[in-house]
Amino acid sequence: MHELGITQNIVAIVLEQARGASVKRVTLEIGKLSAIMPEAIRFCFDICCQDTLLEGVTLEIIETEGKGKCRHCGHEIRLSQPFGQCDRCDSFELDIIQGQELQIKEMEVEELCV
């Protein structure tokens, strides 16, 4: 389960960027072609956040659709797996242009007024 290592890195990045501030919500963007299971990330996130400043933080996951672009005719198609066939010219030569991403999209941080 490579999601544990990925989640440990996500937690480390969020803690570093928060600089001690109270984080309320973390939003991740995970592509459907990334071979990363969102539910496994969610499970690992809860475990990795235990006994840290992130314990109890809300995790939101946005899954992005897979898209490919045909190398022959330039047509864009939806992909549910990292390969496919152009529905315009029947070519199998596609470049994946969306759906492999994993990024921390947003962090909601509570600012303290002093």
From Swiss-Prot:
NCBIfam families: hypA. Belongs to the HypA/HybF family. This is Hydrogenase maturation factor HypA. GO terms for biological process: protein maturation; protein modification process. The keyword Transmembrane does not apply. InterPro entries: HypA/HybF. GO terms for molecular function: nickel cation binding; zinc ion binding. Involved in the maturation of [NiFe] hydrogenases. Required for nickel insertion into the metal center of the hydrogenase. It comes from the Bacteria. Zn(2+) binds at residues 70, 73, 86, 89.
